[in-house]
Amino acid sequence: MFAPPSSLFVPATAPAPSTSGFTIPANLRRDAYVCPFATAEKERKEREQQQPASKGLNHDLAAQEPLHPSLVSRFPSNYRGSFLR
């Protein structure tokens, strides 16, 4: 049976060595986890309250810019921009 050399053997109880050098700051370790989705939802609602709702740049471009001739046959006229409304 093959036995690994003692220099390669690491007992299962040994902690893995940290090679990255990155440590979590103490203030982040103590604080409760904040879900990024909840934060993003809150920020989105704040932005909506500050600005009047616009349909966005993509919607405006889809309404103004004609399709390239090679794409006209693939998309019916009622398809353009329908997913943006």
Curated annotation (Swiss-Prot):
Region of interest: Disordered: 1-22, 41-85
Biased composition (Polar residues): 75-85
Origin superkingdom: Viruses
Listed name of the protein: Uncharacterized protein 042L
Source species of the chain: Frog virus 3 (isolate Goorha) (FV-3)
Source lineage: Viruses, Varidnaviria, Bamfordvirae, Nucleocytoviricota, Megaviricetes
